[in-house]
Amino acid sequence: MSEAKAEILRRIREATADGPVADPVQRTYRRNSSRDRAEVVEMLRDRLIDYRASVRDETEQTVAAAIAELLGPDARYVVPAGLESDWLPADSRGAGRERITEPAVGHTGERAAVRGAHDGEREPLSVDALNEVDAVVTSSTVSCAETGTIFLTGRPDEGRRAITLVPDHHVCIVPLDSVVELFPEALARVEATAPITMISGPSATSDIELERVEGVHGPRRLDVILLDRAR
């Protein structure tokens, strides 16, 4: 620690030494849901639709066709290296849609080049390259139904934050077994040091004259697939 910083902290401690003792933080909030699974999933669906996301139900047998429909016939889209390949359309160069597979990037920034479906080994896409991509398809870590919030934490099936912020269209897969009701339940499933991105609907802001503008801080289109892996 520098001498200047140490001096600043010393003065702060000295100035606040005689201050009042803070009241203890109340932690009597709910930590576990009492609702059944169907209620929790419906709560998440209602919240996401209210936030102007589209929501559809799929199984592992139908999810690839659903993603193909959502992307359209000519999309150029990026997927993280760890996403289940069986969930994706069987796209190849010259077949209309083009899939770009990004390498896995750990929390420390360490890169592991991977061989994509048809792209060979590649480095992570630059921001300029991502700006030329139509969409991104990822999975998710956990979703909080109470707030309608999807958590991404940089896992191999979600990729780094940039790929979910720059493209204008995000197709996000939410496995039903990852849906919880309460925020404390969601945080309990998140690695403490993970880079967390929380998504509650398409990107939108009303900062200027309270007029809603979409797509300022991320994708303006969010399609959520509630994936039932038990069927």
Q: Where does each model-flagged region fall?
A:
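The feature marks the mature, well-folded catalytic cores of soluble enzymes
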Residues: 1-231
